Amino acid sequence: MRPWVPVTGASPHAAVGPAWTTGRRCVGVVTTWWWSVSYVERQVQIIDSLYRAMDASAENGYTDAACRFRYLPEEDGSLGIDSSFFYTIGGVSVSALLNDYGDKGCADLVYDLHDVMYKDIRFGESIRSRMCPRGVNPVPSAPTAPPAGLAAFPSANRRTERCLVWIACVHRLSAVGEAGSLNEPEAARLANDPAEHSNRHVDALGRQQLVCAHVVAGVASDGFGVRAGEERTGARGRHSGSIKPLDNLVVETPIEAARSRHRCAGRPCPRRHRRPCNASKSHRPMRMQQRDRGWTVWQKDFSMLTPLSAGFQHRVLAQQLVARRGRMQPSVVQIGVGRIRADVAGRVAGQDALGRIGRILPNAVARLSIAVRFLRAQSINHSIQSKRDRRSWNGCSKGQRRRGFISIDKKPGPKNKLALMFIREPDRFISIDRNPARRTSWL
């Protein structure tokens, strides 16, 4: 696939940094001059703009999908997430709460990342059916046309504006209730309960949109999710064997996505390079920097993501999910926050609200990265791949390929214990406020 190419004028920041074009030697140049603006001031402006846009959407009566969130640093330096993700899809309110790790399995709320991001989906049944929990039939409800002030934007610009800036934070989302499922009486009660609805709604697909938490649980190339406890067999596409969602939980950095996409014309690199092969232009993979330094690059560059680089990374992630020759992909769970476009009144609502949080919370990001790296090792060790695909992975020795690219799950040590602690006790890393009363008074 071609690298992500922005549409000129699609964003107020489209002129920041170079445009990504096909054949560019280094696609990861990051410009940082505009980070000199005070973080606190910009954060306040961005959050205020977000809420103004949400209010404008609510005033137009457009409440087909809603999302509320806030990311705040805690006093102890951890990543505080005062969040509950509220959706009203087809008249059913679904509150996706950050859930602790246990045996509850993956979320029932399955979201098709590729279709929502890159296909011209109109406001209708396709998105509602994907976002509804299993067992809850989408009910025809709110108007399926965007507000009048948003109809003029062409779909191409809408797709390119849908950039993600995402943090390496492993979490689970479940539907309303600790059990993670909605029965019909409960859904009906929530649909008619005003207390369950926020007055700050934002259209999940519109131009003034906030890219809400994307949950991709067991996504394969055909775009279908694997529900908790289900086994995926070779019934659709070229899947073989079965998939256990917990074993396939991974958050993949742009660096890892670029490295795993490297193929050297479909065979192992003849020189067995530990880094991606630069022998010819056709062999050169997409990557953020000329030198691939793995997790060091990710942790350093996390605080310097421009909207352009964010869009490129998300493009790589989408390719990783949906364009890998029909093979079952590792599950990806991510918190993603995109920019919202100009709202109905024409105000520019700002950039990403999350991209600079690593700048002030380096310890939290590092701790999460360790946990993510452990989960990536677990995922690859248990993922279903053919022998040919394992051999074609570059950037590691034969023994590492045999064990699954990286194998820190085989080596006991403090990082391993930290990762296991993150899985078992996520509240020590992410503060979760489950009190509904406090969720309604953020500003």
Swiss-Prot record:
Residues 263-292 are annotated as: Disordered. The keyword Endoplasmic reticulum does not apply. It is found in: Secreted, Cell wall. Disulfide bonds: none annotated. Its main location: secreted. Keywords: Cell wall, Cell wall biogenesis/degradation, Secreted. GO terms for biological process: cell wall organization. Residues 263-286 have a biased composition (Basic residues). The keyword Transport does not apply. GO terms for cellular component: extracellular region. To mammalian CGHB. Cell wall protein that resembles the beta subunit of human chorionic gonadotropin. Stimulates growth and change in morphology. This is Chorionicgonadotropic hormone-like protein.
